[in-house]
Amino acid sequence: MRLARDDAGKGAPVLLVHGFPTSRRLWLGLTPEFLRAGFRVVAPDLAGYGESPGAPDVGMESQAGWLLALLDELDLGRVTLIAHDVGTAAAQILAVRAPERVRELVLMDGVYETEWAMAAVESIRSWNPEDAARLQPVLARRLRPIRALLDAYVGEEGGKRLIHAARCLDPRQTEGMTATLRATGIPLRLIWGSDDAFLPVDTVAKPLAAALGAPLEIVPGGHFLPVENPAGVAAALLRRRPD
């Protein structure tokens, strides 16, 4: 599996992992800030998302394996791993599998154990593939902050890819993960949108931070923080520079 990716800069590596239903374009507003700060920035499209090829299983457990393969392909030793939404599931699995590859893990508006905000994607999971061409316009209306990121899912083929990706999401893949992740000793941080309606601060972010023993920073904005408030996210991320 060769993941489509953006790769720029020559400093310490930062790996940016998007979630559902976005793509590596989620990070376009943040990448220039990291480059100016002197980092190498690698932002892939997860398998089956954006411009990356699909597979029978594009769940987050499989994604973690492909992300590790990407680190090997690019000869990246240890990275600062920053992930959003269900991409944080892939990031947690990667960190537990190969803690020696992760310098720091930053979880942004992400999953906590089996809390993956599945109610928000349930309608997509049950969408009739025969009507797939109608899916992207519906999502563009519902998810206005990221409507420009949904271009990869235009038309029947794009809609079918998105339905398949939704059906591969399995919250059981991070059940019991929190204690294991904390035991790795990897430095952990959480950054969260103050108005996240999908994975709220009080019911997800704060319990996750407490369980991980990790600092939590609240940034003004909703669930799709890297798009809604890139300046605020960049400031939060770079306040403690990845070494």
Task: Please provide the spans of the model-predicted regions.
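Conserved loop-alpha-helix segment in the C-terminal half of the alpha/beta-hydrolase fold
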Residues: T184-G221, V227
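Conserved hydrolase catalytic core segment
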Residues: G77-A119
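Conserved alpha/beta-hydrolase catalytic His-Asp/Glu region
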Residues: W116, A133-I186
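Conserved catalytic-core motifs of eukaryotic protein kinase domains, centered on the activation segment
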Residues: L26-L28, S52-V58, W116-A119, V201-D202
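Alpha/beta-hydrolase fold catalytic core
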Residues: M1-V14, R36-F39, D72, L76-G77, ...
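Active-site loop/oxyanion-hole signature of alpha/beta-hydrolase fold enzymes
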Residues: R36, A43-I82, A235
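The conserved beta1-alpha1 loop
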Residues: V17-G19, H84, W192
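Conserved HGGG/HGGXW glycine-rich cap/lid loop of the alpha/beta-hydrolase fold
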Residues: D6-E51
